[in-house]
Amino acid sequence: MGRPPCCDKVGIKKGPWTPEEDIILVSYIQEHGPGNWRSVPTNTGLLRCSKSCRLRWTNYLRPGIKRGNFTPHEEGMIIHLQALLGNKWAAIASYLPQRTDNDIKNYWNTHLKKKIKKFQSALSPHMASDSTTSTCTNHQFVPRSYAGDDHHRRGSSFEVINGHSSAHPSLNSPISTYASSTENISRLLEGWMRSSPKATKEKLHQNSSLEEGSIDMTGNSMAVAAVTSVQCYRPKLEQGGGELVANDEFESILEYENLNDDHHQTTDATIPSDDHDHDHEMKMDHDQKKHNPPLSFLEKWLLDESAAQGEEMMDQLSPIF
């Protein structure tokens, strides 16, 4: 148990202080100084307890006490210190030497507490809105995850129906539903790479056959031109007796062209599927072309014939002019 209050003693006066009591207390403290509050009632003859004398001096009678309204700076200090220290008014008053702890306590209970409540009530709608938005965002995250799970479930069911179920449907379902997936592209590329060598071989074979066909067509056209030229100039050979190529030479040329045509037809008809045989046939064809006579003789003969024809035309036209 604590010590009983001194004011409960018999003959101790309670209530407000009178001006006479204030004058006696102030005069005593000016002579002896503030301290040893237990001896003050007995030395001054005041019917007050020591605690009442101390509080009367510190809260009302001591010099330097500031009265009046609190400044905004003092209000901020009181609010900050009250949040840190709580309701320890004496400790708060030590940071405000011109204000007493009693004045600070009274001002807190009558003014500052109400201001803080109003400020909190004004901020409560914003805080409530922030809390609702946070809850809404939290609720938004849940359906998204649920939607993602539903999507994965649908993907897995789709794979099971198609016979492509796997142990991880969440990882494989987007790949299965995607149209141009990497697997399909790789399969297409594999098929293309497998068929590409054959296609290239066929293209090379077609190009070689086209080149040979073009050579045959040029040879045939040249042979036809030679035949027509022989037929045209054969009467002139009989009449005029000009210097033309003999029939034996034309027959040899035509036989060479026919042999060349027959050789190309046989090579085109008997093209092997194997690349080694094809290369061997090409080599044999190349060697045979080396042994055959060149076409420069035919070209030279055609050029000579065209020149002779031009001279005859000029001779025929000269008597006209």
Curated annotation (Swiss-Prot):
Keyword set, alphabetical order: DNA-binding, Nucleus, Repeat, S-nitrosylation, Transcription, Transcription regulation
Which residues carry the record's DNA-binding region feature? 37-61, 89-112
Stimuli inducing this protein: Repressed by abscisic acid (ABA) and osmotic stress (salt stress).
Q: Which GO terms describe its molecular function?
A: DNA binding
Residue ranges the record marks as coiled coil? none
Primary location group: nucleus
Q: Biological process (GO) annotations?
A: response to abscisic acid; response to auxin; response to salt stress; stomatal movement
The record's section on SUPFAM superfamilies has: Homeodomain-like (SSF46689)
Matching Gene3D superfamilies: Homeodomain-like (1.10.10.60)
- The identity of this protein, by name, is Transcription factor MYB60
> What is the source species?
Vitis vinifera (Grape)
Name of the gene: MYB60
